[in-house]
Structures are given as C-alpha cells and as structure tokens.
C-alpha cells in the first residue's frame, strides 16, 4: 500500500524506537520533549498521525498513569474546529500513548519567531480560534494548564490547539512534587506561580498569546523564569501595538485577579462581535468560520513545520 508523502520535519527512527504502535505504522520522529517522544505514523486509513508516547519515568508513576488516562478520555470527547482531536489512545500500554492527526504548518511560536507579528486580521483569527478551542475544552471539564505558542499549530484550515489536559497529569508525579512546576514561564498566570490553577489560568495564557501574535513579542518580555515570574506577579503587560479591537479582551484576560477575567466563551463572543464583516445575528461559531474562510483560506500563514514535542 502506497503511503502519502511524509511530513517534511520527519527524522529517522532510533534503534530503540518502535516500528509499530497498533494500529499505526511508525515511520519516523516528529520531535521529543520532557514528557515523551512524538512519532510520525500512518494509520489504517492511510493518513499521517502524530503519536505521542510517554517517557518511562512518567509511565512508572501510578498517579501519573491514572490522571493521564482520565485526561485522555476527556480529550477524546472534545470536538471543535480549532482543536486537534484525539484519534486513538492506549493509556494501559507499558508506555501510554495517544494519537492526533498530523497537522501541516508551523507552530505559532515558530511563525512569530521567523516572521514577526501576524497581520491584524490574521491575529484576530488566531484569537477567535484559540478562544473557541479553550471554551470547548472548559465545557468538557478540562483545563489545558500549558497553553503556549508551541501548542498552537497554524494549519491550512485554521489555528489548532494541541495537548490540552496533559499538564495536569504531569503535575501528579514525584518529578514535579519535588519542586518542579509544569508550565511555560512566559504564559503562566499569577495564580499558577502561587501553586493554584483553574480555567482562569487558560484565559490569562490566551491573553498573553494573543498579544504575542499581534505584536511579535511576549507581553511580559523575555528572560529567565524568576524574572518572568516577578513581572507577571508585579508589573503590567506591554500591549503597545495591539490592534484596537483586541485591546479590551486581552487587557481583561491579563488581569492579575483570576476572578476578574472573562470566561473563554466571553472572549470568543467579544472577538467575534468585533468582526466588521459578520452578518447580523450570526452566532460566534459561524463568525469564526467566516473569519477563517476570509483571512486564512489555503494556509494564509506560512512557515516551515517546527519539531513537535510531547510536552509542547
């Protein structure tokens, strides 16, 4: 059986890598990270998938396995246009794994690093798509906990959010209980730094990522984890250059008080309502679909695919 062309960022398998993860035939690596390895594989339907396999040190933690199974089961039920769905999973395997479709396109982080800020209309698509995805995730009872530019793929048919819920499983392990903190410093909310987290933390990350998308720089700057923590806890974000229609929702999303932030559904509504081309009375999902068709058709945001990691 002829396989479709391989992903351009596929690298050769190592001697210890599996060649089959039923029902997927493994053809190479897409990337690796702290939590595991991402393999490029072909499913029974002939389509490419990204199969994310947990590292042994996590797989050996009973509490991690329990939470991982729970989170993946929830992820499998979430469906939204701007989410990469779970195709299959085996959380009882010696090394637990789950698979999502392989999505061609750069990550949001790679695209901004290579090309700078997105055009205002494209930034609005990313803002709306991420808000729609986060709202669907929260409606299913899941909190992403590690939203960052590496977890958003700018696919030809719109932005896609990856890997929601997995950071919660990692938080359960001895590897993090001994002092580590799961998350990415530039996108973490004040309460995450204080050791608590809920849906409001995802809203904060949305605000930081939309600002990054539209201005080309993180709203709390660059630097080490301690520097970023201080700025996020004590200083106001730099939102200079943010398009006017995104100023109000982003400012509210970045409020240091989680109780003062809007929900993801409210953010979606505000971004959708700001679309001057939206038909009167159209619902938010219809408006997002229209934004993607008008400003994203055929992969309007271009860039080379970046390596994927199991914790990106």
Each language-model region and where it sits:
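Eukaryotic protein kinase
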Residues: 1-298
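Generic low-complexity segments that are intrinsically disordered, proline-rich and/or Lys/Arg-biased
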Residues: 296, 306-308
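Hydrophobic single-pass membrane-targeting/anchoring helices
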Residues: 310-312
